[in-house]
């Protein structure tokens, strides 16, 4: 049981030490931080309490528990733990408080008793309680019957940390003498938590090990005044009853660690006297669930009036393992029956979150009702990376049933909420504050949260950071240790160190600023020394207030006057300067504020520069102040003086704008403008300044989301009289006219473009840091009858498929009078146009049918069905991938059968290219007859042509018959859905099918041909409703012809043959006659006068060669008209 007791306290242990974070009034400067160190391994700083001793001297101390400190000489042990007293000084160690310096080894053991596991002070001049929850009582030591019981016990010390009266000492061990064993009180572990009530009347103990670690809480009177007044009948009170010891009376589930609640009067003499028992749940007016075993009731404690009733005290106890998530129980006394009744139970929301590990009662909004703060350091949220939580329950005038807590979250694995403490009003704003420890956040952190009229400020005002591990395991506060009227904060750790942070007084410095003259008239110049002849007298005054009212130190400050700070930051030159201060318009002066509400002023002359161009915008002047630290600080009570700090909630500067004298405001010197605004959404072509209006659908502009990076909003602003017949009514110059455009998260300001350049209008647009808002100055003034058109260029990179529309808030502002300047919302609808297209082709596109009819039951392979047709559908995506949008599906209207139920096309197989494995639905439509697939390529005609005796005759003059088959008329179609998962840029689906030959032989053999139409289209399944799919469908046509053998040639009638022969003979005779008449058959003869031949006579001898040479003198040739056969020419 010893091990269990140790785990009871240490399973959330971790961490120590200190340092600064987001600074407010806890002084984190190293010179002002007080650090105290204990012996290594002693767990010095495990528990803390601030104590105010009034006698024998006024002293303020920090009490530090070190439950692993070495034993005192007479304790007969090695480590027993102890309690230390630390003076509030910069140097000097802490002193161990000597008590419990004895031991009886025959009846007790103090080894590892963990004295100092908790420590609490009763308040100024009050008692101190500290406990050792692992203290053991022994019986039959050194025998076989030896037994050990971890009862635990507590010591009460007087204000001077000594044992002086009967109430002091270590007899506070109510479990001793009761039934032993862990089922009852043998592992009581009294003292895991102990506290005093705020009215100093009671002392409260938690014993989470009672009843199988179900836990109890005990309350006893602790007030001498009541004892002296003979008021005895006030307890003790105990959950479960002091005499009954009935664990069923504990109002929380077992294993909750609630501790038995026991209240007893200090003055009782009979231990069975004045006991108030808790009634069984079935007898209680309001039934509450029982707490389970191992719930640890009593693990944390606090109390107060104004929790349920303003007059009755309520005890608050945590049970961090109740119901496996934790619970916190509110308990009250029933004075009539002397019972303790549960008033309310808060349940933890996270499994194993340790809800109730620490509790604090504090009135955060000062409404007179105490609020409850609960730590759950092991709460986690996987999605939000949360590691620990603190729940703040704001009291609704004593009613808790419908209170929804405010949850403060810590970072992952930080154990945020292991310590929660009411630290008092550290900034003296009238509202108490709390501190939350997170020892595993880096080296450990403590978060300071301020109270307010609205309750808790959920953003920490300061974060204290550790310089050694596990800083923030324990926290103490709500007491002024250094006597400056501000509560201080001490932070402990598990690395044997403690840090004290002193609170700095918070002061509010009121700043006023006046300028004379209050307007600049450029026509009135004086000899004041300024280059322009125009001077301004600037005066700023300061005074401070603080709490308490008696705090009146002399404070040195530095006042600063500065003009046109933002203008100079933007790179523009200033239009003014302070006299004798150079070109920078800034003037500083040291001042001393001697006491509260004493006003001190500074004054300087401001010169207007000569030849300034911007005469429309006002000249801003600011006054600010800083506290000046002295070169040497005096010491108070051996500590460095803590300087005051400015209130962070107060404005840092006072501001005034000096305007130029306005013109163009009419005879009454009042400017009544009439600004009007019109807008249109546009697209921008690339990076060019060319804009086109968006199309309008049902009165709303429609943005088609494609690849465009920018859109533009065309804005036109006019300032003209509303009634031309009464032009003096309005339409005056609009001074400081501006347009404020606020954009949704999906749009970001990029730039602005003016339609026409009008220098006198001085249009300029400036966006904030994240581009969510743009301020456009239209002119100062924006004159009468002016108009301007410009474009706000907006980036659409954040517009996604989940963006249904775009809302831009447009608001015109002017310092001139105009009441009708209501904001306008520019709306546009976002349409997602998916660049998906589908096309289809059939291979072959013409097929034949023929042969004989074969029944469905006789078919074993696909070849027996009919001609092969492969449909290929190609899907192309020219846009962005569909991964983040949804799933595209190809829908194919498959012509399965004709209207009488006979097969038309038989789908054999579906294949894909460029996609993940495609599974089309319904699967039963694919090869539903389980035919054997063919692995050979098809020829043009697979069906053997056979003669069919159907008595049909083929006529040359017969009319050609055809029919079109489609789903909407004469075909029963099945919708085949094929998800296109993994579609990137393009993909193909191939549907292998067979023409059902028998159906065509039976139904369509009399037709010359048929067309089969098949339609396919794409749809997208997505959460977005604004999706458009152009060109998302296609149609494929296949033409089917009967084979030639289906229609047999049966001969031509004889009379046609006879007529053809006679017609041919007649035509031949006619042709011969015509040719004869034309002399075609007459033989041609030559005329005698015409020579029949033309030749040259060359005698043979004339061709002879002499001496192998030709004869040079050849004779002239003669023409011959007659041949002489006897002469030789060859």
Swiss-Prot record:
One of its GO terms (biological process) is cell-substrate junction assembly. Disulfide bonds join 86-94, 131-154, 175-188, 528-535, 541-601, 665-671, 765-776, 920-967, 973-978. Residues 24-1050 are extracellular. InterPro entries: FG-GAP (IPR013517), Int_alpha_beta-p (IPR013519), Integrin_alpha (IPR000413), Integrin_alpha_C_CS (IPR018184), Integrin_alpha_Ig-like_1 (IPR013649), Integrin_alpha_Ig-like_2 (IPR048285), Integrin_alpha_Ig-like_3 (IPR048286), Integrin_alpha_N (IPR028994). Residues 1077-1083 are annotated as: Interaction with HPS5. GO terms for cellular component: cell surface; external side of plasma membrane; focal adhesion; integrin alpha6-beta1 complex; integrin complex; plasma membrane. It is found in: Cell membrane. Belongs to the integrin alpha chain family. This is Integrin alpha-6. The lineage of its organism: Eukaryota, Metazoa, Chordata, Craniata, Vertebrata.
